[in-house]
């Protein structure tokens, strides 16, 4: 897990906590192709009126607010959840992208990194998987949107938290391919090397081989 640090400005969170950590809240950034580093830099500036403990993308994670402090990631005037609040939770933001139809999605490597981070926090604070929530579950906000639009994605995420090893990543279309591999895969698609371009079924290792072979 490639962890970086870029602390949020002190005007964007509360120092300390009033309750022990019992929940982990999963968010998405609602941006198109942003990075954990970019978000870390943004929230290091004053008066953003929001924050999260971690930002995750496909190749690294940025710690923005220390876990001992209270990030402003799930506050609201009204709550759907009876107990989860900013002061007893850790907020994790997944960087997002848009497909060719303008719909948000979370890259599979970003999901994998988020799973790894969440598992570590579950173990560290003895948190039940049942207490890993979407922002939506806490306040009703449509976040993370892909995990609300497609409930199966959220169910899969929760299932992966309970597994000892994260399942093998599979890429099924060009939008899911990380930027470093898109050019090589697109060349193969253009040459009609795939019978079904929307069902590529490429593993991470297969993708690396394609790039290394310089297709």
Residue spans for each PLM region:
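Hydrophobic faces of well-ordered beta-strands that scaffold small-molecule active sites
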Residues: 26, 90, 132-134
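Basic/polar, cationic surfaces and motifs that engage anionic cell-wall
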Residues: 1-7, 17-18, 95-168
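Sec/Tat-exported extracytoplasmic proteins
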Residues: 28, 65, 122-125, 161, ...
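N-terminal catalytic cores of peptidoglycan-degrading enzymes
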Residues: 1-85
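Short, solvent-exposed alpha-helical surface patches in non-cytosolic proteins
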Residues: 166-215
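Solvent-exposed, acidic/flexible segments
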Residues: 19, 85, 103-111, 177-181, ...
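Short coil-to-beta-strand
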Residues: 83-94
């Amino acid at each position: 897990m490639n962890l970086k640090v870029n602390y949020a400005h002190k005007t964007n969170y509360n120092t300390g906590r009033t309750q022990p950590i019992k929940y982990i809240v999963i968010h998405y950034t609602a941006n198109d192709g942003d990075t954990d580093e970019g978000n870390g830099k943004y929230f290091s500036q004053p008066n953003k009126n929001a924050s999260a403990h971690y930002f995750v993308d496909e190749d690294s994670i940025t710690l923005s607010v220390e876990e001992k402090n209270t990030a402003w990631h799930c506050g609201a005037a009204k709550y759907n959840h009876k107990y989860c609040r900013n002061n007893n939770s850790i907020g994790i933001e997944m960087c997002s992208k848009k497909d060719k139809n303008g719909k948000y999605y979370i890259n599979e490597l970003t999901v994998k990194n988020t799973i790894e981070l969440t598992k570590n926090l579950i173990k560290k604070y003895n948190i039940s998987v049942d207490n890993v929530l979407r922002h939506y579950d806490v306040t009703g906000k449509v976040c993370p949107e892909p995990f609300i639009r497609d409930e199966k994605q959220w169910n899969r995420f929760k299932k992966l938290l309970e597994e000892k090893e994260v399942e093998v990543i599979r890429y099924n279309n060009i939008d899911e391919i990380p930027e470093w591999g898109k050019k090589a895969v697109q060349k193969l698609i253009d040459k009609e090397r795939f019978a079904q371009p929307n069902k590529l079924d490429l593993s991470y290792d297969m993708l690396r081989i394609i790039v290394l072979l310089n297709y």
